[in-house]
């Protein structure tokens, strides 16, 4: 996992976190979640409350200011860090279920975590030891959570194709549903500007642009139709696994799809519409990507020889950056810690079991019908043989 915040960069792999202050000559910050405290057992139980967790980091995010960083792991920890002036761990708290997504509020005072049971909890940042508060719940597994840029709405998506826009502070007031995806919704991203636009990505291989307050779909793009350079298209579903946005020069978007060795790049036009600008083909399937505040696109490749890639838009084309001092320094740091990072988090499918099962009822019906007709034909033939035998006996 790769996350880039103002002045900092974080890479996770397995249970390990590597934090770095951009431009700093200091040694990077290391943390192994498996060495953190375990949750106390409930009364009457022995050992930890959950001894089956792997300590693998599941979700992470920087605060908007970059001053804080938070992560959750497979042992239900929520760990908060301060990144300025140097990285340090502030607190370890506990969530009730394993989390699928994490985000900060626009003001940076709250962390919102979404879990597999469909609930969203908020945790205070200033009061770093305070327990979480339940904000809202779904009846299905949540896959992402975000907050509108004005801080008024919590936006969630689940495995049942729904995007829900709820009022923060009054979650029983649902502003809208954004409906249109035909598979699970995996990514949400509010876009900067006055239009109150939301971008979503799904297992159906589409990106959709919404006016989220009304639930109106503004535009959609099918990613399969854009990857002309990609071989073996028919065996890929183009499930959207990551979206990142940069607003330094208009709105630029970078999109990853699970199992696709490349990056889709878009801009958002004033209409508004998603305008496809470029597909960057890579030799390996990238693990993650993120924009920094200077409009550079960072890509975590998962290849030890070149673990980190950096792109910049030049003459309306995204081009690889070479001879970059910061990139060289970070590449060396990642390579030195490659074993600890477990290959910087070799990609595992997040979406196994989320696709809708397809049952071909018509084929089953036709097969049963054919068997029934054959059975009736056999019975009719047997009946004719018996009748002929009776006639012969009567004549004799």
Swiss-Prot record:
Q: Which GO terms describe its biological process?
A: tRNA (guanine-N7)-methylation; tRNA modification
Q: Which GO terms describe its molecular function?
A: enzyme activator activity
Q: Name one GO cellular component term.
A: nucleus
Q: Does the keyword Cytoplasm apply?
A: no
- Fetch the Gene3D superfamilies from UniProt: YVTN repeat-like/Quinoprotein amine dehydrogenase
Q: In which pathway does it act?
A: tRNA modification; N(7)-methylguanine-tRNA biosynthesis
Task: Fetch the PROSITE patterns from UniProt.
Answer: WD_REPEATS_2 (PS50082), WD_REPEATS_REGION (PS50294)
Q: Where does it reside?
A: Nucleus
Q: Cross-referenced SUPFAM superfamilies, in alphabetical order?
A: WD40 repeat-like
Q: Which UniProt keywords apply?
A: Nucleus, Repeat, tRNA processing, WD repeat
Q: Does the keyword Nucleus apply?
A: yes
Spans of repeat WD: 52-91, 94-133, 137-178, 180-220
Q: Function, please?
A: Non-catalytic component of the METTL1-WDR4 methyltransferase complex required for the formation of N(7)-methylguanine in a subset of RNA species, such as tRNAs, mRNAs and microRNAs (miRNAs). In the METTL1-WDR4 methyltransferase complex, wdr4 acts as a scaffold for tRNA-binding. Required for the formation of N(7)-methylguanine at position 46 (m7G46) in a large subset of tRNAs that contain the 5'-RAGGU-3' motif within the variable loop. M7G46 interacts with C13-G22 in the D-loop to stabilize tRNA tertiary structure and protect tRNAs from decay.
Q: How does it assemble?
A: Non-catalytic component of the METTL1-WDR4 complex, composed of mettl1 and wdr4.
Entry's family note? Belongs to the WD repeat TRM82 family.
**What is the protein name stated in its UniProt record?**
tRNA (guanine-N(7)-)-methyltransferase non-catalytic subunit wdr4
Q: Which organism is it from?
A: Xenopus laevis
**Lineage of the species this protein comes from:** Eukaryota, Metazoa, Chordata, Craniata, Vertebrata
The encoding gene is wdr4
